[in-house]
Amino acid sequence: ELQEAQQPDVYVIIGTAHAGLEHLFAVTDKDFETPLGLVPTDQSIVQRLKALVPECMDEEIAHQSEHAIEFQLPFLQTSVSKPFTMVPILSSFSASSLTDPTVQHSVERFLTALRDTMTESGKTVCVIAAGELAHLGLRYGDKAPPTDFSFHRSMQRDLEMLKHVEELKPAEFAAYIQREQDQ
């Protein structure tokens, strides 16, 4: 479907910063290279974001040890039939932390700046939430190794959650995540 659709000029990829971030969002102006070639970062959008929210660049080093952005790139490189740029963003906050007014303000400030910057750019933009779904096993806090049952139950929950995204129901999506306590 993506190959047949009108394709955007820019892909804003928001991925998970597993080690956490002090400022909740980390943007980088570095290009990314995969075995399929170089994916350039959209410098004009990144520089505008930097002007509006300077601290978003403070932890760009976090990109060095993360994989959330890179996982999306080979898919885009093989599916998008025209040149494109990206805006790589790492984020680190939980749905439950949004009850903290300071966290909520920081998130709203960054997302407003991002939305305004995308609009002002005049470019067509696609936002990719490069979030990871369920993690199973002892290393993720489970009391036992995963079984076929736990795997399928987890997959059902992930699909339930994604149904709200597919149906463009952000309030239901947020409520689901809070109910599941970001698990």
Model-derived features with residue positions:
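Active-site histidine-anchored catalytic micro-motif
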Residues: 1-183
